[in-house]
């Protein structure tokens, strides 16, 4: 069941505008306009990481199944355990990460 949920989520991510993917840190990572915003674990089928603004990250961490992700990476990432979080809820966090990445992309082009 975990796989099916993750596949559904990946499919939704792939269809967002300006999204591309490449492997990074053992994750299948997706970027929006060149800024990474989500990664799907290749080791287990229930872990995803999402890049968020500091405020939104703090909001996310208060939820069941969500914790800070700091695998040698910069702060600003969360890890979601898909065994504890509904796909629809996870996708809401993914969309927040996507919008954050698009905002970062616009800032770096100024």
Regions found by a protein language model. Give the residues of each.
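Charge-dense, helix-prone N-terminal extensions
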Residues: 1-110
């Amino acid at each position: 069941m975990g796989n099916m949920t993750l596949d559904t989520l990946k499919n939704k991510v792939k269809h967002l505008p300006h999204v591309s993917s490449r492997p990074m840190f053992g994750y299948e990572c997706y970027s929006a306009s060149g800024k990474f915003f989500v990664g799907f674990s290749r080791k287990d089928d229930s872990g995803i990481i999402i890049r968020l603004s500091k405020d939104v990250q703090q909001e996310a961490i208060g939820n069941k199944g969500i914790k800070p992700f700091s695998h040698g990476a910069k702060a600003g990432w969360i890890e979601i355990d898909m065994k504890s979080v509904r796909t629809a809820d996870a996708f809401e966090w993914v969309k927040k990460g996507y919008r954050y990445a698009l905002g970062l992309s616009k800032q770096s082009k100024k």
